[in-house]
Each structure stands twice: as C-alpha cells, then as structure tokens.
Amino acid sequence: MTNALLEDLKWRGLIYQQTDESGIENILNKEQVTLYCGADPTADSLHIGHLLPFLTLRRFQEHGHRPLVLIGGGTGMIGDPSGKSEERTLQTEAQVETNVQGINKQMHKIFEFDTEKGAKLVNNKDWLGQISLIDFLRDYGKHVGVNYMLGKDSIQTRLEHGISYTEFTYTILQAIDFGHLNRTYNCKVQVGGSDQWGNITSGIELMRRMYGQTEAYGLTIPLVVKSDGKKFGKTEGGAVWLDAAKTSPYEFYQFWINTTDDDVIKFLKYFTFLEQEEIEALEKSLNEAPHLREAQKALAENVTRFIHGQDALDDAIRISQALFAGDLQSLSASELKEGFKDVPQVELSSETRNIVEVIVETGISSSKRQAREDVNNGAIYINGIRQQDVNYELTSEDKIENEFTIIRRGKKKYFMVNYK
C-alpha cells in the first residue's frame, strides 16, 4: 500500500536516504507516528539553510503525525563534526541558552503547537545534562564500538586533520537523544539533512543494542544545491536569517524573488506547501512566459508569508514595487535604509551644496564635465525626483531625517549619500 505523504515527498525530491523504506511506509500507514528533527543552537537564529529538514517535518504534521522539535542545548555545548573540516569553537553555557530561546520562538512559526496533536519542543540538555561521566561510559559507551565510530564519514573526514575526543563523542550524544525520545515519547523516526545520516544510524544501532528496539527509522533529505553550484542560503551580505532583526522581511523576500529560472521549480517543491497542480501550473508559466516571473513571485510570497506573516509580506512587496518604480517619496526613512542597504554608500561634506560638485565629490560622476552632462541629460535623480538644473543647490529638505540623500544616476544606479 503506497503512502500519500511519502509519494508527495518523493515527487518533491525530498527523500535522499531511508534506513528501511518498507518499514517507514508500513508504520506511516498503520499509525500516527511520532518523529523528530533537531538543530544545535550555534546562533540565536536559524537561517534558511536550516529550513528544509524542519519544513519536511512539518509536512508529516500536515498528514496527522506528531513532530518533536529538538533544540540541542546539550549537544550545542559540544559541537557536531558532521560536514565540518575543523574543530568548532565552544560556546559558553549562557550563549547557548540565549540561542536556545531565540530558536524556540522561531519554531513556533514553523509548527503548530497548540492543537491536541501539536508539535512538542524538547531540549536535550534536560536529559544529557543528567548523565554523569561514569554513567556515560558504562551505560552507553560500552555499546558503541570504536571501529563502528571510525567508519562514520563525519569522523573519517576529520581524522587526517585531527578531531578532539569532545567532537568524536558527539554521535553518541545524538544517539542517546533518539533513544531517549523513543522511550519517552515512542518516537520512531528521525528526520535530518544528508550530513546527519551517520548520527541517525548511530541512534538506531544504539537502541538495538541497548534494549532490542528494531522499530526505529531514519530519513534524510538532500543537500540543497543551486544550479550554478554555489552554496544555497548565502548572499554577498552573509547568511539569510529567519530573525527579522538579522535579515529584514524585505531582504528575505528579495532573496527568494531573485531565484533563477533553473532553481525556482525545485525550490517551490522544497520550500512551499503548494499542491502539485499549482506548482505544475507555475512551471508551465515559467516555460511559456518566463518574463512574468510568476514562479518566483509565488515562491517569495509563500515563504515570506510562512516565516514572517502577511503584514510583513505586504510591506516587502510595497517596498519592492516602490523601489522598482523609483517612487521613493512613498517610503519611510527606515524603509529606504532597508531597501538601499546594499547600494554604494558614499560620504559628502555638509559644506558641498551644488549638484555638480556633489556628484563629483561622491564619485557618482567622474568629472565636472561628465556631471554637467548627466544633469543636463536628465540622468540624475535626488530622492527619486529628476534634477536637470546644473545650478541646483542641495538644501536640508534633500536630507532624509537630516541624515542621508538617495541619488540615482541613470535607470538603476543608486547611491546612498551620508553626510560627514
């Protein structure tokens, strides 16, 4: 008997590996399954590189299964070597706790917690913190062979350059997590990124050895790779965070709206809850009228709404449309700063007033001759208003909040002029 959820995951390309394909299908067909996915609090916010495993877990919730969302307050004190070429810097306990609180809030955007079968947040510090060193070595270490651990890719790739005993034992801690959740909540499936395969199978093996549990499974999702081979989730400005204070909803929206034609359908399948028919219709539009960018708009709107809400999405669209149209007058100072964060920032002495001198001093035009031509030809805009008078003098009215002026040269070249 096929399972609708698994068929949907396969269609979306979300299944990379399964420890027991028929076993997972059987339990999903016969019962409401409790399953989990975890993240270590390495920062006080998740970024979009963390999203896919948790969105996949949410798909299980949409089909009636119960997610456990694990925040690694314990394992975060240690550091996962998976996918890392060098040792992590240990965080203080206070920093880890701050990070846990930040991520907890974000999980409430991704999962439903307040229903009868809602998700549950758990922190592995609650049980790992209770295990003494002697208990760890006797109760758990005795069941884990060194040769078995050395066979893990996450360990092997680090042996050449060195790995501390601290990180070497990480996989045992995550294995303990799976066992604890299995015995406490009857959790039978762990979901994770493809780099978590070794940690997931360690948990299944530890449960089998310690108390004969054979009904435990793992499912991993693929690494998100862009068509150009570049790392997903990074911009020139760094990571794209879920925290609006780190990455504004406008910047978040812009990240998704700028998805290439080659990636957009894959990302619609990965990151949205749109049905197959809706995505296929967007794919048809992409093939027949790519200039409309309907697929990109659907992606940006759905993901931004899911993470930041409708109001933030509306603001992001409004700012985007105003900037595209050059309608700067309709935006507040904070929205302008947000929208022009990545344009060249230039400084101007407050004494300089004449428009020609202004655009030469700031480097917007290369010479006074070029500056005069730019002004005369209508290529210069002050705060969105074309200025064609070479004798124009900037006044306090041209300073937004007495702090900056937006100058545009040509159709799209913007500069934020800050006053010394």
From Swiss-Prot:
Could you tell me which species this protein originates from?
Answer: Staphylococcus saprophyticus subsp. saprophyticus (strain ATCC 15305 / DSM 20229 / NCIMB 8711 / NCTC 7292 / S-41)
InterPro entries, per the entry = aa-tRNA-synth_I_CS, aa-tRNA-synth_Ic, Rossmann-like_a/b/a_fold, S4_RNA-bd, S4_RNA-bd_sf, SYY-like_C, Tyr-tRNA-ligase, Tyr-tRNA-ligase_bac-type
Q: Which residues are involved in binding L-tyrosine?
A: 36, 170, 174
Location comes to:
Cytoplasm
For this UniProt record, give its keywords in alphabetical order, as a comma-separated list: Aminoacyl-tRNA synthetase, ATP-binding, Cytoplasm, Ligase, Nucleotide-binding, Protein biosynthesis, RNA-binding
So where does ATP get bound?
Answer: 234
- As annotated in the record, motif 'KMSKS' region runs over 231-235
User: What does this protein's UniProt record list under function?
Assistant: Catalyzes the attachment of tyrosine to tRNA(Tyr) in a two-step reaction: tyrosine is first activated by ATP to form Tyr-AMP and then transferred to the acceptor end of tRNA(Tyr).
Q: Report which reactions are catalysed by this protein.
A: tRNA(Tyr) + L-tyrosine + ATP = L-tyrosyl-tRNA(Tyr) + AMP + diphosphate + H(+)
For the keyword Endoplasmic reticulum, the answer is no
Write one Gene Ontology MF term.
Answer: tyrosine-tRNA ligase activity
What name goes with this protein?
Tyrosine--tRNA ligase
The record places the motif ('HIGH' region) at: 41-50
EC number(s) per UniProt? 6.1.1.1
